[in-house]
Amino acid sequence: MNLSFDVITKEGDKIVVSLNSFYPYISELIGNTFPQLEIVEITIVRESGEKPIKMEVFGRIAQVLISIAQDNPDTILYYFCDMTEGLPHQRSGRTLSCQEYRNNLFKHLFQRYSSESTEHWTDIEIEMRSTQLEQTLYAHFLLRDKHLPLVDILRNEVLNNFKSISDQK
């Protein structure tokens, strides 16, 4: 899957949401068990605008993503919470890292909008502690119940990939 859509806010900000096949390969075990499976990475990029993006905009994005996933029954959505600065991350009097802010936002949005879906979805959160970056990084897989047997494999692939990248630095 390779598609994207633009979201233009009332304030004129432009956000581009892309969905692209995440792994050009899927581990042999996953491929043998679920030959039609596609893991799709979600990328959200703000192309213009400087004011904080309202929750209703993120809500619209989440609704579209859930709709796309529902239309593609052999799809697992993947999201890595990036470290781009520029977002407000104050919550209850404490400062959150960009990663933690995005992690909480992603969890909240998909819990809310996946509950409106006709299917049951599970959000698998993966925490990766980086001593080099001195912070915790987060990734998520959003998957259907039929894909739950893959959780450990997916988690291990992300953690092993993260470890190999961390070891190179």
Question: Can you say where each PLM-predicted feature lies in the sequence?
Answer:
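Non-catalytic substrate-recognition and accessory regions of acyl/acetyltransferase enzymes
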Residues: 1-169
